[in-house]
Amino acid sequence: MDSLAISPRKLRSDLYSYSYQDDSNTVPLVISVLSSLIERTLARNERISRSYGGFGKTRVFDCREIPDMTIQSYLERIFRYTKAGPSVYVVAYVYIDRFCQNNQGFRISLTNVHRLLITTIMIASKYVEDMNYKNSYFAKVGGLETEDLNNLELEFLFLMGFKLHVNVSVFESYCCHLEREVSIGGGYQIEKALRCAEEIKSRQIVQDPKHHHHHQFSRIML
């Protein structure tokens, strides 16, 4: 995993001052961490498949041809063209984890991982950030037809039961998990995007819990 070891002081500095528009060539460290996690998951699922056969019954994200691009390169491409902040990738990771837990017949594999990533990152971007690209743009970045990505988004939302809410404590716990994943390697860290956490907290205050899922649906479908 190509990450740069940083001190706590540098981490705090990056956390509060990291600018994607001013420094467009700097890839967030969370991308390396997330790609490493997914690569390990792919390897584990491949071993399970060889031992027990099959990759599960949920095949909604399967593609006919496996993209000739590593997970790291694919995530870097998404960042390069969307400038999605670190918090988007953390929330996408939350969604992927929830999806796998809620759909026991699904396993991440080479045939579905790229489509799963572009779909969850797009949805997470809509949930986290104020300004977003259209689905057609995300489709172009991800190498899909717009209609295909629209269908994947709807399938994902229904399979998730529209449970997209990520509160501050959940967000922080996943950040800590990602940090623990790389701490063994010598003090690696990821950006947690404090602004995102504060925005999520403010939304919790203004949103009516009784209408929460309807509100999320309106955000996603815009």
UniProtKB/Swiss-Prot annotation:
Keyword Protease: no
Swiss-Prot/TrEMBL GO biological process terms: cell division
Record keyword RNA-binding present: no
GO molecular function: protein kinase binding
InterPro entries documented for this protein: Cyclin-like_sf, Cyclin_P/U, Cyclin_PHO80-like
Keywords on record: Cell cycle, Cell division, Cyclin
Known tissue expression: Expressed in roots, stems and flowers. Expressed in the shoot apex, leaf primordia and young leaves.
Pfam families: Cyclin (PF08613)
Superkingdom assignment: Eukaryota
PANTHER family for the chain: CYCLIN-U2-1 (PTHR15615:SF15), PTHR15615
Record note on quaternary structure: Interacts with CDKA-1.
Family the UniProt entry places it in: Belongs to the cyclin family. Cyclin U/P subfamily.
Protein name: Cyclin-U2-1
Native organism: Arabidopsis thaliana
Gene name of the encoded protein: CYCU2-1
